[in-house]
Amino acid sequence: MNEEYSLQDLLGQESELQFAFFNNQTAWKLGCQLKKIAEDNSTLVAIEVYAFSQTLFSYAMSGTQLDNQIWIKRKRQTVLRFGHSSYYIGQYNKAKNREFEQQVHINADDYCAHGGAFPIRIKKCGLVGVVTVSGLPQREDHQMVIDALTDLIKSVQKS
């Protein structure tokens, strides 16, 4: 699908893709699911699952660079600060005809509004972390995260 998600679609993803529980083992499964998706599609990405103020999973595929880690940090910080996916923040600012990184209160060295980072939320609890992918065009980074979360949440609900 090449068309952009609407802001409502992106908010719907955030509302729908929440965990009943999340722990270190869940983070590991999520990271491994992302790695498998990347390998199955022969894509080169860096992956991070960050929760409870620590990195619980980090993997950089052969062929990625330090720059991917810098993008991961900036995307993660955006989600932690604003509570929405980095893709939503970018699309929201695009709809407002403004550049996120050029706003006075934003340091572009610390934050970016490019897709690939998504909030990890526990139902009835709130934001506990961020899952991030870097290495593809932003919509594809975002979609990879959505696909992994969808698969993992479905499998957790069945067990």
Swiss-Prot record:
It comes from the Bacteria. Belongs to the UPF0303 family. This is UPF0303 protein Ping_1243. NCBIfam families: PRK02487.1-5 (NF002696). Gene3D superfamilies: Haem-degrading domain. PANTHER family: PTHR28255, UPF0303 PROTEIN YBR137W. InterPro entries: PduO/GlcC-like, PduO/GlcC-like_sf, YBR137W-like.
